[in-house]
Amino acid sequence: MHDKILILDFGSQVTQLIARRVREAHVYCEIHPNDVSDDFVREFAPKAVILSGSHASTYEDHQLRAPQAVWDLGVPVLGICYGMQTMAVQLGGKVEWSDHREFGYAEMRAHGHTRLLDGIEDFTTAEGHGMLKVWMSHGDKVAELPPGFALMASTPSCPIAGMADEARGYYAVQFHPEVTHTVKGRQIIERFVLQIAGAKPDWIMKNHIEEAVAKIREQVGDEEVILGLSGGVDSSVAAALIHRAIGDQLTCVFVDHGLLRLNEGKMVLDMFEGRLHAKVVHVDASDQFLGHLAGVTDPEAKRKIIGREFVEVFQAEAKKLSKAKWLAQGTIYPDVVESGGTKTKKATTIKSHHNVGGLPETLGLKLLEPLRDLFKDEVRELGVALGLPPEMVYRHPFPGPGLGVRILGEVKREYAELLRRADAIFIEELRNTTATAQDAAAGLCGEADVGKSWYDLTSQAFAVFLPVKSVGVMGDGRTYDYVTSLRAVQTTDFMTAHWAHLPYALLGRASNRIINEVRGINRVVYDISGKPPATIEWE
């Protein structure tokens, strides 16, 4: 039996990251709404409780509170941002609106040598104070500590940035240790979970395979399942996991919607029919998809259309399978959280994902999502544990709507042809270029990265088609052609990301090849936006 950490979600967009950090410590955790009952909390029997952040205000919203059972259990509790504020209010402290709202990096001083922060620091001041580089995102602040609490951390703008009641194991921080922007955040959460809570680090993907296979068999029984296979990491791992559980009861439906990468269809069929010996049905529905997308420019509308058409294709294929009762998808945690689909339904929607936003209530198939609770790196670990080849497992993620969300505005067959060729050139240059000692010296990568391909050193890379034209010169003639943007990011969880600092020579070669080899594109730009404020995909 795994030790469990209970994460109470107050509606933050990054609550899922808390779960990821806990699981990185190999400890099992679950996310549940903040308004679960006292009986639920007691029956869950957590080793510790973590209270998430929220876009709400403790000063204004008196309904968002943790169940009383959290404070009655006698287990350690960690409050993060809003979680700190509700802890303060519920235990007798005071919270007030701050005149100075903090959003972004801050340098925080630790106080009191608490079990949570003692010895964890990014640098020390001339006076010997331990300092942490943290990520803040709050408007309210704790103005008065609850009885029994001591100051644990502060910033110039937030005098009480952390508080602790060591006797009861209650800790709270105003910053977000779960995001990668907080340099030592992972270490802080790991210390809370392993040392303060004393949870056993026995959550590993091999264990998850056994549990997931058993759950799939229990859900499906002797019924048949169809799965939309895109060739991406998520659908591939989902297919392998389901195939292990139910074998030939699974039929993979590979839909060519006209928005795939270059030569992707052949690769997918060779991989799944040849290597995994899975049943694969190939459906060419490009005319259907592109026809419905004609004239549509709104990103949300495009995603909804693509999701709807996927469902219609699946329903048509399901009718040919007498026992097909289930539609399987490679939905993962980031898909759910960015669609406002956390279990609390309190997160603010950023964009709809076709996996969760395009399914009508009238769907005649039940939904099977075996990866729904996993992050991308967990999915990759699971794929390796299932025996999938590295070239599949470590391939960069590709969105379900395909090139449909990488072509800004209206989707046309002509645009898709230009984009897939430009994208293939960029990916080829990334694969064929290795990091050098000079790159490391320039700070573009670490010394341990020298010799690795830049494809492996980036988490996701692709080209984006911009439906605008610019003037250029080719030979002695004037050109008036389209623009493409190259995008490459580095991230550990895909919830936050930094733009990749690629060598200029690599970018130069990619740009030169695209302009010379892809007739119709005469200008290439590079996207240097992080997430946040931008999302990884442009649409």
Swiss-Prot record:
Record-level GO cellular component terms: cytosol
SUPFAM superfamilies reported in the protein's UniProt record: Adenine nucleotide alpha hydrolases-like, Class I glutamine amidotransferase-like, GMP synthetase C-terminal dimerisation domain
Residue intervals of the Glutamine amidotransferase type-1 domain: 4-202
InterPro entries: Class_I_gatase-like, GATASE, GMP_synth_C, GMP_synth_GATase, GMP_synthase, GMPS_ATP_PPase_dom, NAD/GMP_synthase, Rossmann-like_a/b/a_fold
Keywords: ATP-binding, Glutamine amidotransferase, GMP biosynthesis, Ligase, Nucleotide-binding, Purine biosynthesis
Catalytic reactions of this protein: XMP + L-glutamine + ATP + H2O = GMP + L-glutamate + AMP + diphosphate + 2 H(+)
Occurrences of domain GMPS ATP-PPase (ranges): 203-395
Catalytic residues (positions): C81 (nucleophile), H176, E178
Pfam families cross-referenced by the UniProt entry: GATase, GMP_synt_C, NAD_synthase
Sites where the protein binds ATP: S230, G231, G232, V233, D234, S235, S236
GO MF terms held by the record: ATP binding; GMP synthase activity
EC number(s) recorded for this UniProt protein: 6.3.5.2
Pathway membership, UniProt: Purine metabolism; GMP biosynthesis; GMP from XMP (L-Gln route): step 1/1
Assembly with partners or alone: Homodimer.
Described function: Catalyzes the synthesis of GMP from XMP.
Protein name (record): GMP synthase [glutamine-hydrolyzing]
Species whose genome carries this gene: Burkholderia cenocepacia (strain HI2424)
